[in-house]
Amino acid sequence: MSAPTENCCARRDRVLVFGEEENAQKGGNVAADLRQTDKTTISRHAERGSYDREAAYAILDEGMVAHVGFNSDDGVIVIPMTYARLGDELVLHGAVASRWLSSFEQGRPVSVCVTLLDGLVLAQSAFSHSMNYRSIVCFGVATVVNDEAGKSEAFKAFLDHHIPGRWEDSRQPDAKESGATIVLSVPIDEASIKVRSCPPQDSEKDMGLGYWTGVIPLELTPGEAIPYPAMEPGKDVPDYVRNYARPIRG
């Protein structure tokens, strides 16, 4: 048996089809749409990288948590934050009382990372185990959204991103709640994505060892909605709750 191709190529959908690996490799990287710089250029397994804007949007639209990194007087800080995409911008929000976020008033360089985990990859050797994933890293200056119209648009985007349909089915933020919240905007410009979606990449010498190899697919799936005990009885579960699902875009 010949050894599999060493370089595992990226595919934009989350469906693992071993036979399509070869065809995916022929495509190479998509033409740069996001801005490629020294920081965003992928050097290791460059064949998994892309600067395609639509592919980046698909990852961001499916993800739910971003890890935001920035320098502070106390060193490098990384904070998990909820986010939403508004066109070609990411909006993030947190509490005005946060000592970290209050320092963003004049704008601050950040890196934003979103990762979707699609599978655990089991190889013959412990060293060759891996994960299938889709990820984006974005660099830019985070600026504070101060106008009320912009903040209101961001609040709606946050809820629509995580629970489509809920904004119209809930009380909107009042002035006090808006004043207690800081909204940050980061351009989706200097960024790159990286995707792994393929079987184990065992070396030829390990292929005959006889261990089970393959992929354990992983995905985020909702369970049955749990009603709040203090809610008025007889309330029907909304369709957007009963049919909740994250977007999956190829």
Protein language model annotation of sequence segments:
Residues 2-3:
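Short, low-complexity intrinsically disordered segments enriched in A/P/G/S/L with frequent Arg
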Residues 8-9, 18-40, 146, 150-250:
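C-terminal edge-of-domain segments
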Residues 33-91, 102:
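An N-terminal domain-cap segment
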Residues 64, 79, 86-88, 106-110, ...:
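A generic structural signal for short beta-strands and their flanking turns/coil linkers
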Residues 89-91, 111, 194:
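General beta-strand recognition
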Residues 90-94, 184-185:
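A generic structural motif
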Residues 97-157:
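Short, structured beta-strand-loop surface elements
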